[in-house]
Every structure is written in C-alpha cells, then in structure tokens.
C-alpha cells in the first residue's frame, strides 16, 4: 500500500490585493509566533537535547534516530492502534516489519551506527510497550550502552507500567522518555481505551481510564524528580479529545514535562483500527496547527514530529530502515566510532557557520506587523535548502513575519518524479495540498510543476539552493516586502 497523502483536507484561500496570501492557510489564521524552541534554556538541558532529533527541532536537521522493535507485548488497547497491520510503505507509530530479539537488536544497532554517522539516539518505541515488555527492553538497552557508549538511549511508553521501572531507567542512563497521554479526564479516556491490563487483571471502562491516568501522572512526576527529560505525545482525535488537550497540556506542564507533541489521528479504514473501521475522521492540517498554537505558553510544543514507525532508522523524513534487514547484521561486527566522531566535528562547524550567517541575515524589517508569509521548503537535512521538489517525501512549512519565523508543520507526500518521469496524478495531489501557501523554496524544480504551482498562486524558486533555511526565508521575506524585482529570486 502506498503511503500517499494524508486524508486531512487543506483548503485554499483568496489572495490579498497585493497578490500575497499572507495570513491564512486552509481555514486557519496564523499568529505572528516564532519558533517554539525556547531561547533561554539551562546549559544542562541544552546538553541533553542538542543531538536528540525528537527533543530538539535544530537537532533533527543533523542527527538520526533508530527504533528497535523488540517490545512486542502491550498492556492497553487504544482505539487508534492495530499493531498487526504492516506495510513497507506505511509510516505510523506501532508499525514494524520485523520483531527483533535483544541480540538481533544489538547487531542491528552496531550495523547502523557504523553506516549512519548521524545516528545519535537509539530507542525502543514498540511495537508494543517498552515498560510492559520490560525484560526485552532491559536486555536490549544494557548491551547497547556497553557496545555503543556515545549514543543516547530513550524509550516510548503508554505510562501504565512506567513507575516501577523509573529507577532502572536512571541506572541504565536512559535520559529521555516519551509518554503517550491522551486525556486527564477518565470519562474522555473511555472513548479512547477499551481496556487495560494492570496488576494481573483486565480493567474496562472508567476504571481502566482512571488507573491509566493515575499511573501516567505518577510516572511523569517520577521522571521529573530524577532528571529524566519527558516528552508527552498526544493523539488529536476530533470530537473526542481535541479541546481537552489544552487541559492535558496544563497538567503535564505542572508535572515537569519538557515538551508536548500533539499528533494527528491516523484513521485509515485499511489499518483495521476501531476508529478507522468506524470512520472517525482525522484532523485537518489547519485544525492541528491551530491547536498547537493554542498550546503555546504552556509546555514547549513540538512541531517537527514525523509519527515514526517502531523500526525507523535515519534522519526524520529520510527513513533507511529497509537498508538494514535481518540478514544484513554480521554476527561479529564491532562498533567503530571514527565516522561518527568526524561527522560530529563537521556538524559543530556547520552549526557555528549557520549561527553566523543567520545573525548576519537578521536585519530588522520595516513592515506592517500583520504582514506574514507562508513558505514551503524541501530539504534533505542539514538545515539547508537542498531538496529537489520532484524527489521530496515531505515539505516543511514555515511562517515568517517581521517578528521572526517558525516551523509550523510539515506535509508527508509521495515523490512524483521517479526514474526521470513524473507521475501526473501524484503531482496534482501535491499541488492541491500546497494551496494557500505563498512560496515554495527548493533546490530544483521542473518547468511544468513550477507553472502549475504558479496557476494556484504559489511561486516556486530554486534561487536559494544550498542556503540555510532560516537565511533563505528571511531574505525572501525582505525581498517581497520591499517589492524588489523577484526575477532573481523567483
């Protein structure tokens, strides 16, 4: 099955009199917010997140993660989950092509670490629950910490079995934990969780949701007390918990969560989930972005999540899991840190260069305070404009205004240009999804897609190829506001 476009609808907006649709995307009116990554942060926290792609928007441009699918057992049933479903092209949490033993996981981790110098994090995110299937989780992470000592370790959990393992996590030097928390009101929980398995018995209904809620809050508090960074994932389910997630954000902030990641429900009927089979709709992209903006000022909001598979490998948006199948793990391979050390030195230079260039580009702009552009960018990583439009598997969307710029989300797409030929239907789907944006910045784009985008009111440019993204969108913004001739830029 093809991954395809999301079911979430993105509608068009009318252009302003000046020809730049500067304030809306879909049904959503944008605020003038900048990046949600805090400017002032304790040095110890910066050190913890600087190379963790899931906890830092900047880090995800440079560093890769690896999920090891060893935890197959789970202790709750979610209405949005069916772990039995798998497709090589399907990208969503809980999906894995193969379950690994702890020994296979170690060999895969070493193979990936030797071939992917960007690797900085090894985690267990399913396909079941890392804390409930604790024996396998522990048997996997301990040897990895011994054999690959320069990677960070993390886990993802529903939180039900988390409290009894927090001290073990500290002893194993696991510094990052993600908890999926979809409610703090058990009445809402009954619409999401049919049952849980806790303390040797199965619970249903309000009792199940109450126990889960209490255990999640306890686990989060324990992580905070012990200095483990906690990220909270929440699935936005329209009509079920979408408004309630504002309350969830307040609760997790009070208990020390570092980051809150609100993800859209994925409810394709073919996945066989309760929600999918009952036609529960997923949120429109405009609804998701609007909710994330309403959460600003609470726990830091994550906007670069890719809803990764339980066996994901590589940079976010550039999965390489299929390069490392079971038969490709040499039994006697040992870890060699040379490539990774060289890469880290390169990235330090890149980051210093990016900081200097962005500082030079940050010239104050004289413009109306409500003037805002929506800019799409294709990138292969490194924080640069370096992605060919026809080969892109995702498009990042930025808002930019006089006060600054910020990543507001991304669109997952199928590349329309394969083997030198373009798939017309795929291209049309992508163009429909980009309606309402102002400019597309990419490294290259063909004449036909460029003209089609222009007819939809989206200008495309390859003039900033190789530039840092922040620098490129800032320069483009100034050119537009000053009514400069855009022939050289567009």
UniProtKB/Swiss-Prot annotation:
Pfam families: Nitro_FeMo-Co (PF02579), Radical_SAM (PF04055)
Assigned EC number: 4.-.-.-
Domain Radical SAM core: 60-309
Binding sites annotated in the UniProt record for [4Fe-4S] cluster 2: 305, 308
Cofactor binding note of this UniProt entry: Binds 3 [4Fe-4S] clusters per monomer. One cluster is coordinated with 3 cysteines and an exchangeable S-adenosyl-L-methionine. The two others probably act as substrate.
GO biological process, alphabetically ordered: nitrogen fixation
Statement: the UniProt record of this protein carries the keyword S-adenosyl-L-methionine: yes
Residues that coordinate or bind S-adenosyl-L-methionine: 80, 128, 180
Binding residues annotated for [4Fe-4S] cluster 1, in chain numbering: 74, 78, 81
GO molecular function annotations of the record: 4 iron, 4 sulfur cluster binding; lyase activity; metal ion binding
Keyword S-adenosyl-L-methionine recorded: yes
Its biological purpose: Involved in the biosynthesis of the iron-molybdenum cofactor (FeMo-co or M-cluster) found in the dinitrogenase enzyme of the nitrogenase complex in nitrogen-fixing microorganisms. NifB catalyzes the crucial step of radical SAM-dependent carbide insertion that occurs concomitant with the insertion of a 9th sulfur and the rearrangement/coupling of two [4Fe-4S] clusters into a [8Fe-9S-C] cluster, the precursor to the M-cluster.
Family, similarity comment: Belongs to the radical SAM superfamily. NifB family.
PANTHER family referenced in this protein's UniProt entry, alphabetically: FEMO COFACTOR BIOSYNTHESIS PROTEIN NIFB, FEMO COFACTOR BIOSYNTHESIS PROTEIN NIFB-RELATED
The name this protein goes by in its record: FeMo cofactor biosynthesis protein NifB
Gene source species: Rhizobium leguminosarum bv. trifolii
Underlying gene: nifB
